[in-house]
């Protein structure tokens, strides 16, 4: 017996349009890590772009470079090592002070998202550091060293929006952005 996966690009197009409508005025960032979850990033990115994607998100720099070759839309990467060369044209998450300082010292002005820890306990700035981090990032942005595009976090139970911990994390995130 052999298994065959059939990827329905029409369904991907439909779902992208549906999500774009539901997003309203917000940007739709399509996450295409792990070869678009094994759907084929080279096939999915153009379909998503044509149907309303505003940006793409990936885990690694290798994935970011692959997606960058497929689109001119923003590409954001959240897992990278501060010792890596920082590529131009890819937006990077800053989950630690080491990451943020590396971005501030880049030879160009990178775009970043500050990652805040809201309860997943994987990565991100702890609430006790938010004031210091936000002040440093604002100062660096005013000096033209970085461009802060937003904040991000990682929900522990995003697949179950009814879980009360999701509300707890959402409230922590609202505190971070206030």
List PLM regions with ranges.
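Active-site-proximal beta-alpha core segment in soluble small-molecule metabolic enzymes
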Residues: 3-6, 11-14, 24-178
């Amino acid at each position: 017996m052999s298994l065959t996966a059939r990827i329905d690009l029409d369904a991907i197009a439909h779902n992208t349009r549906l999500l774009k409508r539901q997003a309203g005025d917000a940007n739709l960032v399509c996450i295409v890590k792990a070869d678009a979850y094994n759907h084929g990033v080279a096939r999915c990115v153009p379909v998503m772009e044509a149907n309303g994607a505003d940006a793409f998100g990936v885990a690694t720099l290798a994935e970011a470079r692959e997606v960058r070759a497929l689109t001119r839309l923003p590409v954001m990467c959240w897992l990278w090592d501060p010792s890596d060369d920082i590529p131009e044209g890819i937006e990077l998450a800053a989950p630690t002070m080491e990451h943020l300082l590396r971005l501030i010292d880049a030879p160009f002005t990178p775009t970043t998202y500050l990652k805040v820890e809201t309860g997943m306990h994987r990565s991100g700035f702890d609430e006790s550091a938010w004031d210091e981090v936000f002040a440093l990032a604002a100062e660096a942005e005013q000096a033209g060293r970085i461009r802060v595009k937003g904040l991000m976090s990682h929900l522990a139970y995003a697949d179950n929006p009814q879980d009360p911990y999701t509300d707890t994390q959402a409230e922590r995130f609202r505190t971070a952005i206030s």
